[in-house]
Design a protein with these regions (language model features):
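Vicinal oxygen chelate
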Residues: 2-20, 31, 40-90, 98-124, ...
């Protein structure tokens, strides 16, 4: 009998899951996320552009960008009637956040209440990734 823990043991904890986006230009994408969505660059490599990767943070939410020269994300939106999401970000203040970006050209779908109770809106970044911001509305 082994003394090693099982995969579901409480001492083996997953701390987070990080959506990872392939992009052609990590630096330009990181700047877009900072300017339009309030993310900050928590780290990047190497120390100067062109970066191979960057980690972006907004509160506890993290996104990772990985450089693939010439990469273009395929449009998967036609695979299901509701569209295709690349990341779902749960947040407090979703209504207030929506008001700060409302009417911008990167809004993919407006703030709506879903049948399951969440208020959500969608953003499409310059690389074609669709992020959903959802939570309780606070308007």
């Amino acid at each position: 009998m082994s003394d090693s823990p099982s995969p579901g043991s409480p001492e083996i904890r997953i701390r987070s899951a990080v959506p990872t986006f392939l992009v052609d230009d990590v630096g330009a994408t990181a700047r877009w996320y900072a300017e339009h969505l309030g993310f900050r660059t928590a780290g990047h490599f190497p120390s100067s552009e062109p970066y191979a990767y960057a980690s972006l943070m907004r509160g506890p939410a993290e996104l990772m960008l990985l450089r693939v020269a010439g990469y273009r994300k395929p449009d998967l939106s036609g695979l299901r009637p509701e569209g295709s999401w690349d990341a779902y970000i749960r947040m407090d203040g979703v209504g207030a956040f929506y008001e700060t970006v409302r009417g911008r050209d990167f809004i993919h779908a407006p703030l709506v209440k879903r049948p399951y109770g969440d208020w959500e809106f969608e953003v499409r970044d310059p690389n074609g990734y669709v992020l959903v911001f959802g939570g309780d509305v606070d308007l």
